[in-house]
């Protein structure tokens, strides 16, 4: 299991002093088995499954608890905002809202300190050429820590991406959120002047911005660390390079589908997005398009982050 060491001064925390200390686990306890469609990785306290068809996790069990209610996804879509009213048609024409991940080859290498799983994949949609070429590498340690390294090449004939990241559908009991980034209100690359960088705590309910017309909301920009937990267990996402996250009871599909806020129906999960980047919000409902420096127009990029499920001991 992983235990936490915190360094707190008042309400602020030195993230670099926050360390996750694994109990001694010898690598011989890590078992890796695969068949035509799945890779099963099992340690003393965890059991993970990766689908070879997507290169993504379908099961993430730690200390006997399943963290994922539904399979993990690569995510390039967001529920269009009022300011996306014009670019939305370009995104829809590119079928970004219907995109999914398809893996072609997978290599499994077991070493001294864990297992490394590398897949070559694409983000695709029906009737259009490949949107993204992706190399996904997972490194899983014997204590259950997961390091992700996702290298992406975008077809530059496609429009700017709404976002790129990983979407997880977590156990709904993981309702307490602690993060180090821009807060306490929602923040985006071009919408954070009223926010400040610091350590914040909230419940998932608190992170939802209740716009009358449902749309993308509640993201937090420039984060180094986010933790979702309850009184007994949790999961951490962290990265050396700042990222954005979103934790919500509503899927992007639900936010897009409904016309009024009172029509929204909660998911059976905490929808947890860990994002490399999102396109800027802009003001194009009544003003200019997103400024060039806030457009997510990268053609080559690499997203590295760490996931650590844990129990409180």
Label each PLM-derived region with a short phrase:
Residues 18-313:
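Beta-strand/loop-rich accessory regions of lumenal/periplasmic or secreted enzymes
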Residues 2-10, 14-15:
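Single conserved hydrophobic/aromatic residue that forms the stacking wall/gate
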